[in-house]
């Protein structure tokens, strides 16, 4: 078993978000050709529902899902789903970059709609995992923790760097 886990399905780093690859418990590579958060949510939901018999339904389980998006560069529909981008594409920059310290004329500001679309898509994918817990009758006896490894400055403080800075926007999650 991979790292002592009965079930392992791991993101294979440095992928395009709509063309990711993964490694499973047996070391098999998977290339699903779909936006990674939606794929990962489906895999997690299948595990929760025990669709493939990967866990003992009478025993508690631990499931960790680490989605890569939202992750820079947020430049195109390759980084998000069209339905999520549609929520933001026509909004003026002042409605997207609402922090008082946002510098709205930075080059990075052009990526704001793609960034927020990616965030919305991750929210939707996470909702699918929560729905699977509810459908499986596990919500009363399950602890769910949502966390992130860093924030995003998104033009705040006048920096292009999303995370490698000492600012609250990049450190708070």
Regions inferred by a protein language model and the residue ranges of each:
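Active-site-proximal cap/lid insertion segments
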Residues: 11-34, 38, 48-173
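Short, structured coil segments at secondary-structure junctions
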Residues: 3-4
